[in-house]
């Protein structure tokens, strides 16, 4: 009888340990109140799967700034795919996506939106923020090589999504019949091959009523393809209040075809299913170490 009770207790304890949500202790914003002059961590909110090829982060810094997200900033310029190990080494293969409403603005300064940390949620594999100036809620949850964005728009006849391929050599192409944008960025900070490119594929679940591209700060409505130092693409549509638009994004250092292959990682899962799978993946890694004693702040420091 004692053996049966002991076995039952061990199984129950095991189930409790397995079910524990270790991600509740992780704060991706920890260490982001840093600058060139003073570091409190020199980190950024790296939203990713464990050991993912790509990280995604809200971008408050200017294009090329190693401090791509700082806690004291109050405007977001975009949501960036990043591979940056530290602000001193900087980034490579980066590009961004940003929802805009009302007047069409694609310049990173003019499209930027005020935000508050009160309207921001950051976990290891999920990020959400309210962009006040555009009245858009942006959410993202990644896999190893892909990411699913969920934009909740207001009622507006002029809702847009800007894809910024950044400077130092880039290319974009809008494919309306497939609700798709493809492109590549060559931006880097050294340490890459001469023919380096990060190819990306973006698929939307809403047809475009507006199509345009920009090159070196010049907007060209109706032009579906650009290759220049700094390029980007813009698609638009009218939206109802609370209408959700999804963007499925994947990239590859090999080719457009490989980027499309990587996009299959998202499968047919819903946004919630992908977010849960990301949370489960992090719990599997974080749960390998269980600490005893200490207070909540110490737990947060350890697991972050």
What are these regions (language model features)?
Residues 20-304:
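Accessory carbohydrate-recognition regions in carbohydrate-active enzymes
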Residues 1-4:
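Positively charged n-region of N-terminal signal peptides that target proteins for export
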Residues 9-18:
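Hydrophobic h-region of N-terminal signal peptides that target proteins for export
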